[in-house]
Design a protein with these regions (language model features):
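N-terminal secretory signal peptides that target proteins for export/translocation
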Residues: 1-2
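Bacterial N-terminal signal peptides
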Residues: 5-15
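Boundary at the C-terminal end of the N-terminal hydrophobic targeting segment
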Residues: 18-23
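Active-site mouth of glycoside hydrolases
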Residues: 28-291, 330-331, 344-347, 353-355, ...
Length: 459
């Protein structure tokens, strides 16, 4: 999830290698392998039958915040959760792998974490649910050896950190090579390239030299729009591209049939105003060639917190969403909404009216319907409401914290399963990337133009 105080948060999961765990033969596959359906920009099984990911981000409400799922994993509780997900119609779970449970030491994966992941895969097989591992993430701890600059967002151009990630994927994907229960690997939850770091000037100098340009210092975060600033944004995009490409290559070398994506922060598409450094630099058209599909996360924050105040506010957020999905769809790969959800009101929004379950369900329905022409799968943020969370995770679940089915939980899977094959990218204004990454006013103008086109297209 996007990192907004008291609003949204993201997660990730970790895994272990055969070098660090019992090299016993893997469990036999019980689920058919899911592959990309190139013709329909979606997914299918190896028999050619359509597969629509009806997904959920899985963590438990009784494991702390950030969730310490692996350290507190209970097999029977996990099995009951998968039973509930099966009853809800869920067919894929996104889980967050952590350094603390899976990759606490360089060069090896943790046997205890791998054993727990093996158990989770066996449970998933039992209930016919695929697993979408994300990570590794620093929720439980971030080892110094993989975070040499002391800031996870500063590591995208750091060779030590990137090599540790390549090693991780080589071990993890190698251990689970051919395990069809794993739907796809997500490289990381919501990566964003930091504006400036200890490595930035050196890397920037190298990039400028390679393009035949003279030395200039790293621009200030509040610099006025200029060609130098535009170049620096392209430089940041090049770091994101290399970071994705090297990890994807490591996974494919270990398991050629594995699917790979990365969970994009919505600020990867500057369709609404973002500051120079807030732009995540994971531009879809730049990273998509190295991915099997594009995964976008979205929360309704157009012009501030979405408060269910009427059609104008709803359309403002849906138009921003559609414009972002549109940019994700342009590279021609399948698109998935890897995180979404909203509730609003009450303690999450002081001064805002508490929202209802019906409003949560209506927002979810509109999000799915608006994105369906370009999207092939959806992942709700959270199975359960999570009272201890510091963001919308408190109330975005399909179930209440004590396991009662909510309105959205009842409607979610039937709605997604009714969605047709994606029909294509709608005719709308194109995002002016050249100016939107350097000038907030350009994004504001685009947002207004797109909103008008979106409104005019509504039935």
């Amino acid at each position: 999830m996007a990192h907004w105080p008291l609003l949204v948060v993201g997660l990730s999961v970790a895994f272990v290698s055969s070098q660090a765990a019992d090299p016993a033969a893997p469990s036999p596959n019980k689920l058919p392998k899911i592959v990309v359906d190139v013709a329909h920009k979606g997914f299918m099984n190896e028999k050619g039958e359509r597969f629509i990911p009806v997904g959920v981000n899985y963590y438990r409400p009784d494991t702390g915040w950030a969730p310490q799922f692996w350290k507190k994993m209970d097999v029977e509780t996990t099995r009951r959760d998968f039973q509930k997900m099966k009853e809800l119609g869920i067919n894929v779970v996104r889980v967050f792998v952590t350094y603390g449970s899976f990759y606490s030491q360089p060069g090896q994966l943790d046997a205890e974490g791998l054993a727990k992941f093996d158990q989770l895969l066996d449970i998933a097989d039992e209930f016919g649910i695929y697993v979408h591992p994300t990570g590794p993430e620093g929720w439980e701890m971030m080892p110094e050896w993989t975070n040499p600059l002391g800031n996870v967002h500063a590591n995208h151009g750091n060779e030590v950190s990137l090599k540790s990630l390549e090693d991780y994927w080589t071990m993890f994907a190698g251990r689970y090579r051919g395990r069809s229960t794993i739907w796809a690997y997500d490289l990381k939850n919501e990566p964003s390239v930091i504006w400036d770091s200890a490595d930035s000037q050196k890397k920037w100098d190298e990039w400028r030299t390679a393009h035949g340009q003279p030395f200039v210092p790293v621009p200030a975060k509040d610099a006025e729009p200029s060609e130098i600033v535009a170049d620096y944004q392209r430089f940041r995009e090049s770091l994101a591209k290399a970071w994705v490409a090297r990890q994807a290559k490591a996974i494919k070398a270990a398991d050629p049939k594995a699917l790979v994506t990365v969970g994009l922060l919505q600020w990867s598409v500057p369709a609404q105003p973002v500051t120079l450094d807030q732009y995540a630099a994971f531009r879809p058209e730049v990273v998509a060639p190295h991915l099997d599909f594009v995964s976008l996360h979205f929360y309704p924050l157009a012009k501030g917190i979405y408060r269910y105040t009427g059609p104008d506010a709803e359309n403002a957020n849906l138009s921003v969403l559609e414009s972002m999905v549109r940019e994700c769809a342009k590279p021609g790969k399948p698109v998935v909404i890897g995180e979404f959800g909203w509730y609003g009101g009450g303690p999450l929004d002081p001064g805002g009216e508490p929202a209802s379950e019906d409003q949560q369900a209506e927002w979810g329905k509109r999000l799915v319907e608006v994105t369906a022409p370009m999207v092939s799968g959806w992942f709700n943020w959270g199975l359960y409401d999570t009272p201890e969370a510091k963001d919308v995770s408190r109330l975005t679940g399909l179930l209440t914290f004590d396991g009662q089915e909510k309105v959205w939980g009842k409607e979610y899977a039937p709605l997604i399963k009714s969605m047709p094959v994606p029909s294509g990218i709608p005719v709308r204004p194109d995002l002016p990337w050249g100016t939107a990454t350097v000038d907030e006013l350009a994004s504001e103008r685009f947002q207004a133009e797109y909103l008008e086109a979106f409104r005019n297209a509504q039935p």
